[in-house]
């Protein structure tokens, strides 16, 4: 059960990450809330209670992630669950023929670096700390949950970088599950559809309504709390491993 678990949530200051940190804390887990120094992570951690600790982290930095894990070890003694919610997006066509301009390579690399390399960085370092845990009755020592996107499967115009970065997260899930199985560490990936996150909240109401109607059922945007609920379900179900779970209301994005 999630109660008394020690967790690390990246991207925990907003959106899916914040909802996850909030649910875990309410269920009695301890949370290392990791986000950029410029985020509202410190305020969020104070709001969520004494068992939530903010650590400033750039997920692409080995030093930052190692510091967050050391905080988990020093303050709570171990790490049971890592949830990778940190990420970024861009909307740029491969080539803009109207302006005769190609997609900037550095922008493509930045998205890959944060979403793919950053996720793997957190996974590999978390696994090292989890491996020191005493196994439970199933031999489990830890659980890792990643965040991909339906864009990994149904990428839209202008989403080459974002889709590639999330498809890589999908692709690494099974081999990492196999890598870590000998130490009793499970890993799953959640692929959200259209969710009521700060990014979508900034869109006009007319656009949000249109997007909601594109979802077969239920015809509404997903709530971050529903993502967080799935994180808890993955943690508490020992047979979920090496799997990618779409949470999208049967949405299949058309170009």
UniProtKB/Swiss-Prot annotation:
* Reactions this protein catalyses: a (3S)-3-hydroxyacyl-CoA + NAD(+) = a 3-oxoacyl-CoA + NADH + H(+); (3S)-3-hydroxybutanoyl-CoA + NAD(+) = acetoacetyl-CoA + NADH + H(+); testosterone + NAD(+) = androst-4-ene-3,17-dione + NADH + H(+); 5alpha-androstane-3alpha,17beta-diol + NAD(+) = 17beta-hydroxy-5alpha-androstan-3-one + NADH + H(+)
Q: Which PROSITE patterns match?
A: ADH_SHORT
The protein's matches in Pfam families, at most eight in alphabetical order, are given as: adh_short
Top-level taxon in the UniProt lineage: Eukaryota
State the conditions that upregulate or repress this gene: By 20-hydroxyecdysone.
Supply the enzyme class, top level. oxidoreductase
Q: Does the keyword Isomerase apply?
A: no
**Entry's Gene3D superfamilies?**
NAD(P)-binding Rossmann-like Domain
User: Do the record's keywords include rRNA processing?
Assistant: no
| Binding, substrate | 149
InterPro entries (UniProt xref): NAD(P)-bd_dom_sf, Sc_DH/Rdtase_CS, SDR_fam
Question: Which tissues does it occur in?
Answer: Found in many tissues including CNS, imaginal disks and salivary glands. Highest expression in both embryonic gonadal primordia and mature ovaries and testes.
The record's EC number reads 1.1.1.35, 1.1.1.51, 1.1.1.62, 1.1.1.-
Q: What is the effect of changing residue 163 to F?
A: Pupal lethal; pupation is developmentally delayed and pupae fail to enclose into adults
- Compartments where found: Mitochondrion
> What are the record keywords, sorted?
Mitochondrion, NAD, Oxidoreductase, tRNA processing
Residues the record marks as active site: 162 (proton acceptor)
Knockout-associated phenotype:
Embryonic and pupal lethal. Pupation is developmentally delayed and pupae fail to enclose into adults. Males, before the onset of lethality, have small testes and degenerating spermatocytes with a large accumulation of small fat-containing vesicles in the cytoplasm and almost no mitochondria. Photoreceptors fail to differentiate normally, are unable to form proper rhabdomeres and contain smaller mitochondria with swollen crestae. Larvae display reduced ATP and mitochondrial morphological defects, that are indicative of mitochondrial dysfunction.
A single GO BP: mitochondrial tRNA processing
Q: How does it assemble?
A: Component of mitochondrial ribonuclease P, a complex composed of rswl/MRPP1, scu/MRPP2 and mldr/MRPP3.
Q: Give the protein family.
A: Belongs to the short-chain dehydrogenases/reductases (SDR) family.
Q: What does this protein do?
A: Mitochondrial dehydrogenase involved in pathways of fatty acid, and steroid metabolism. Versatile enzyme presenting two types of activity; L-3-hydroxyacyl-CoA dehydrogenase ((3S)-3-hydroxyacyl-CoA dehydrogenase) activity and hydroxysteroid dehydrogenase (HSD) activity with a wide substrate spectrum. As a (3S)-3-hydroxyacyl-CoA dehydrogenase, it functions in the third step of the fatty acid beta-oxidation pathway, a major metabolic process in which fatty acids are oxidized to provide a significant source of energy, while also generating acyl-CoA metabolites used by many metabolic routes.
- What is the protein's name according to its record? 3-hydroxyacyl-CoA dehydrogenase type-2
Q: Which organism is it from?
A: Drosophila melanogaster
Upper taxonomic lineage: Eukaryota, Metazoa, Ecdysozoa, Arthropoda, Hexapoda
What gene is this protein a product of?
Answer: scu
């Amino acid at each position: 059960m999630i109660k008394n678990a020690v967790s690390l949530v990246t991207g925990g200051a907003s959106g899916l990450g914040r909802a996850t940190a909030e649910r875990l804390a309410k269920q009695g887990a301890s949370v290392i809330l990791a986000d950029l120094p410029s985020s509202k992570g410190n305020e969020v951690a104070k709001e969520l209670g004494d068992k939530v600790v903010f650590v400033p982290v750039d997920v692409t930095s080995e030093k930052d992630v190692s510091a967050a894990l050391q905080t988990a070890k020093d303050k709570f003694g171990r790490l049971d669950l890592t949830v990778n919610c940190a990420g970024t997006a861009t909307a740029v066509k491969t080539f803009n023929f109207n302006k005769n301009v190609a997609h900037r390579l550095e922008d493509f690399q930045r998205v890959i670096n944060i979403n793919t390399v950053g996720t793997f960085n957190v996974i590999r370092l978390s696994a090292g700390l989890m491996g020191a845990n005493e196994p439970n009755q199933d031999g489990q020592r830890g659980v890792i949950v990643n965040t991909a996107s339906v864009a990994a499967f149904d990428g839209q115009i202008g989403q080459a970088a974002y889709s590639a970065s999330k498809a890589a997260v999908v692709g690494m899930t099974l081999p990492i599950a196999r890598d870590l199985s000998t130490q009793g560490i499970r890993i799953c990936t959640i692929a959200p559809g259209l969710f009521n996150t700060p990014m979508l909240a900034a869109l006009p109401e007319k656009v949000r309504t249109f997007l909601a109607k594109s979802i077969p059922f239920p015809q509404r945007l997903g709530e971050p709390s529903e993502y967080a609920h799935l994180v808890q379900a993955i943690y508490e179900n020992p047979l979920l491993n090496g799997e990618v779970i779409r949470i999208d209301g049967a949405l299949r994005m058309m170009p």
